[in-house]
């Protein structure tokens, strides 16, 4: 007899709603009347044979042995009185399947959440395997998120204990889910912990890319591909997947078990290395912190109470707008009006100077041991850092003014004559070019497979980043400053554009048919007029505002982010991302063309009058200030606990919070 909402089990659990149903059981949302909380209740179907009852009870016993926070525990065990069906209760998970963390977007926040979840699930599997248990059926539906975004493994109905594996096969039937099944399991062979790691790799592949590694018209087609076909590179399906993440996924999906990571603990370590690679390359090497251009860097100075100059070096030329300091590993780079790109060690020691035939004011891009930089003579170069050799050179008809943007094995570069060029990253050959309606000064952004480019005649263009095909465009006003984009809930984002005339627009985006689209007929969520020219890009952070932030009285009621925008006249404002309401404002002593940079809850600013500041991003309070004789137009870099600033007179300085021993040496 089927159960219905309102049914009371064991005099304690009132069934509220059916959450899901499988071949052996139903899962309900239920109210625990004794403890006054909602739980998930799993009850076996009443028509199943005794063998399935044994499997159901084995799942309960298995869960009872596991105590890792990444495994859903058993809260209670009972029996439905009429048919004698066993049931057990578990915590109710409200975050949905792990696929809600994807597909991956090119911004630090979503990537960090993915890596945190991947490492947590890997450690949970290690705990499971250390008890001699193999799950055998990991799928996105069996890895659910809690309300903090951490994954919990559940549904151990096909669990294989090392001494009982032979009892869990049926003649002619392969148990498991084909889309996530290891090759040895697909062939009906023996399984072990590495089979689960393969399945977790397939699950995380789907999270990262939006689809599993293999799809087909039938289960047999999918199983065949798992056994015999090479795994498609995840970067081909979703170019936002970082190289470090792609490498781990492909390693997990090796056909031979002995070529995969050998334990969940080893896998968790690989995710930690991928996170380190993300922090050292994603945010520093590309202008404004990556392809989303949020202006937020993950590892800048967290303490600024005693920030002092660490070193300074003279550059062979002035440094002016729209230049920016970028970095990778132990190198920082900035271009000059003298026609050179200068690379310096983070210690202040010179590394290399690369020449151009004209000014190098567009921000460079450092990636994978190479540097990409454009000049005013219309040349764009790729140089190998170790040898200094030029890999290729592309000649355009006008100067390059925006930062080269690496995406999907290509390079997107805007030129002054209104063309957005897509070049092969490997060869420099032109893949496509798009002609906007006017000159381009802003750098492109990439989100959800779309290149977003503003021009100086007032239009925001959205293109298919692979083909250059126009998707849509919207009129926003003349734009010199590169916009910034902050992903929201999966499949959504907010794009913030500051126009030259002083209007700041927040535009809602969403994924439609795999590409970025305007969110609704009126996608402009709010507009704020700074009543000044704007040359600096806005900076965005997802930092939520606590009640004691000292910002606007109702700031705590509007979580979701902060926008920092600077007018050319020197007035800087903090706005709520949700609605554009004022949080704080501060007037600086000098014009602002350098874009603000956010890191560790601080916003770093520099003026043409030589004033450097660190403000609390929540309330605008000054945490550090310094004045130099020369002004700044280039966007600084906050990385590895250090602030790097290139001054208009051609001086590059590094600032860092002083260590006590260093300070005493300075004073002595």
Swiss-Prot record:
Regulation: Autokinase activity is stimulated by DNA damage. Stimulated by PQQ and DNA ends in vitro.
PTM comment, free text: Autophosphorylated.
Induction notes from the record: Expression is induced in response to DNA damage.
Active site: 137 (proton acceptor)
Keyword Kinase (UniProt): yes
Binding residue positions for ATP: 19-27, 42
InterPro entries: Kinase-like_dom_sf, PQQ_b-propeller_rpt, PQQ_rpt_dom, Prot_kinase_dom, Protein_kinase_ATP_BS, Quinoprotein_ADH-like_sf, Tyr_kinase_AS, WD40/YVTN_repeat-like_dom_sf
E.C. designation(s): 2.7.11.1
Phenotype when the gene is knocked out: Mutant exhibits higher sensitivity to different DNA-damaging agents. It shows altered phosphoprotein profile and impaired DSB repair. Deletion affects expression of genes involved in intermediary metabolism, stress response and growth under stressed conditions.
UniProt-recorded name of the protein: DNA damage-responsive serine/threonine-protein kinase RqkA
């Amino acid at each position: 007899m089927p159960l219905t909402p309102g049914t009371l089990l064991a005099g304690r659990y009132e069934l509220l709603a059916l959450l899901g149903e499988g071949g052996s059981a139903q899962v309900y949302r239920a109210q625990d009347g004794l403890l006054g909380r909602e739980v998930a209740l799993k009850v076996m179907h009443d028509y199943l044979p005794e063998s399935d009852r044994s499997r159901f009870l084995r799942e309960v016993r298995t869960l009872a042995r596991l105590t890792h926070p990444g495994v859903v525990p058993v809260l209670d065990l009972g029996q439905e009185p009429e048919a004698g069906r066993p049931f057990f209760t578990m915590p109710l998970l409200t975050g949905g399947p792990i696929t809600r963390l994807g597909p991956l977007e090119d911004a630090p926040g979503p990537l960090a959440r993915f890596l945190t979840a991947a490492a947590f699930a890997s450690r949970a599997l290690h705990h499971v395997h250390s008890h001699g248990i193999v799950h055998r059926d990991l799928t996105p539906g069996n890895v659910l998120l809690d309300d903090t975004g951490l994954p919990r493994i559940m549904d151990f109905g096909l669990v294989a204990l090392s001494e009982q594996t032979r009892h869990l096969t049926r003649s002619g039937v392969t148990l498991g889910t084909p889309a996530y099944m290891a090759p040895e399991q697909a062939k009906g062979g023996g399984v072990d912990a590495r089979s689960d790691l393969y399945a977790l790799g397939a699950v995380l592949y789907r999270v990262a890319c939006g689809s599993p590694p293999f799809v087909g018209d039938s289960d047999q087609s999918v199983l065949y591909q798992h056994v015999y076909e090479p795994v498609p590179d995840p970067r081909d399906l979703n170019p936002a997947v970082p190289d470090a993440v792609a490498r781990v996924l492909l390693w997990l999906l090796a056909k031979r078990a002995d070529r995969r990571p050998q334990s969940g603990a080893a896998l968790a370590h690989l995710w930690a290395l991928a996170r380190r690679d993300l922090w050292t390359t994603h945010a520093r090497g590309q202008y404004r912190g990556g392809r989303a251009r949020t202006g937020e860097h993950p590892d800048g100075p967290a303490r600024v109470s005693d920030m002092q100059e660490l070193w300074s070096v003279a550059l062979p030329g002035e440094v002016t707008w729209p230049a920016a300091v970028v970095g990778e590993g132990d190198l920082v780079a900035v271009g000059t009006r003298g026609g050179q790109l200068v690379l310096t060690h983070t210690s202040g020691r010179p590394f290399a100077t690369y020449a151009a035939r004209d000014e190098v004011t567009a921000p460079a891009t450092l990636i994978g041991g190479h540097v990409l930089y454009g000049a005013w003579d219309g040349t764009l170069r790729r140089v190998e850092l170790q040898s200094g050799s030029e890999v290729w050179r592309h000649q355009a008809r006008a100067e390059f003014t925006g930062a080269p943007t690496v995406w999907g094995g290509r390079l997107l570069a805007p030129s002054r004559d209104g063309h957005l060029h897509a070049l092969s990253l490997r060869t420099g050959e032109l893949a496509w070019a798009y002609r906007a309606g006017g000159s381009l000064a802003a750098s492109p952004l990439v989100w959800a497979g779309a290149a977003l480019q503003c021009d100086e005649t007032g239009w925001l263009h959205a293109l298919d980043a692979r083909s250059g095909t126009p998707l849509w465009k919207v009129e926003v006003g003349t734009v010199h400053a590169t916009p910034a984009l902050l992903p929201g809930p999966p499949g959504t984002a907010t794009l913030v554009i500051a126009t030259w005339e002083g209007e700041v627009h927040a535009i809602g985006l969403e994924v439609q048919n795999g590409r970025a689209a305007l969110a609704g007929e009126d996608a402009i969520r709010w507009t704020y007029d700074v009543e000044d020219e704007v040359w600096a890009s806005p900076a965005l952070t997802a930092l939520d505002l606590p009640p004691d932030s000292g910002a606007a009285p109702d700031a705590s009621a509007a979580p979701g982010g902060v926008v920092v925008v600077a007018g050319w006249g020197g007035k800087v404002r903090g706005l709520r991302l949700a609605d554009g309401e004022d949080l704080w404002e501060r007037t600086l002593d000098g014009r602002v063309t350098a874009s603000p940079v956010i890191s560790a809850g601080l916003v770093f600013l520099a003026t043409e009058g030589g004033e450097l500041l660190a403000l609390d991003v929540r309330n605008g309070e000054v945490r550090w200030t310094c004045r130099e004789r020369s002004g700044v137009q280039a966007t600084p870099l906050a990385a590895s606990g250090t602030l790097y600033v290139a001054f208009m007179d051609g001086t590059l300085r590094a600032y860092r919070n002083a260590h006590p021993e260093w300070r005493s040496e300075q004073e002595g």
